[in-house]
């Protein structure tokens, strides 16, 4: 078996820390979090984005939500129901189901060895592309920097174009 045995996990320490956390902050934990998420968490995410990705964002620009389906619904509301959305093909088809459940037009963009084919975005009149360039599912492709610049070039040609980057596991990326 590849699994680490439970004998190595410090259950006693873990249980003690959980008890301390719950008893020290009972009152605070019972309050509903603010819309958009707990400020301390959004501040930590903003620091992480700056330190590890070079992105300068304020905590007010970060929204914490209860799962991807909910958050993609918010994105659709913000970007517009009139936009034509697209996802990678092959790709994570649950994303297409989410877009379809919000009654937006969603298409598929074929991939080659470097990721999505940028020319198809133009051909299909796509407004919003949903990609996972750091580790594409299910192919595992890491989009090279040249293709990323092509994608940015596509987006810059019209103010109605957007890129949704699903960076679900970029911390595990070793190349690209």
Predicted regions and their residues:
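N-terminal basic, amphipathic alpha-helical segments
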Residues: 1-19
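Conserved core of the PLP fold type I
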Residues: 18-21, 25-160, 170-174
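Walker B catalytic acidic pair
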Residues: 166-167
């Amino acid at each position: 078996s590849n699994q680490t045995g439970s004998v190595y996990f410090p259950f006693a320490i873990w249980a003690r820390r959980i008890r301390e956390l719950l008893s020290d902050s009972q009152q605070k934990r019972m309050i509903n979090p603010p819309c958009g998420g707990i400020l301390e968490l959004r501040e930590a995410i903003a620091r992480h984005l700056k330190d590890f990705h070079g992105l300068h964002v304020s905590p007010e620009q970060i929204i914490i939500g209860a799962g991807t389906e909910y958050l993609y619904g918010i994105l659709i509301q913000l970007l517009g129901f009139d936009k034509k959305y697209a996802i990678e093909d092959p790709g994570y088809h649950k994303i297409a189901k989410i877009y379809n459940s919000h009654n937006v037009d969603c298409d598929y963009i074929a991939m080659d060895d470097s990721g999505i084919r940028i020319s198809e975005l133009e051909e299909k009149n796509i407004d919003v592309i949903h990609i996972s360039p750091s580790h594409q599912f299910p192919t595992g492709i890491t989009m090279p920097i040249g293709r990323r610049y092509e994608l940015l070039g596509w987006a810059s040609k019209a103010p109605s174009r957007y890129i949704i980057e699903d960076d679900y596991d970029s911390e595990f990326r070793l190349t690209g």
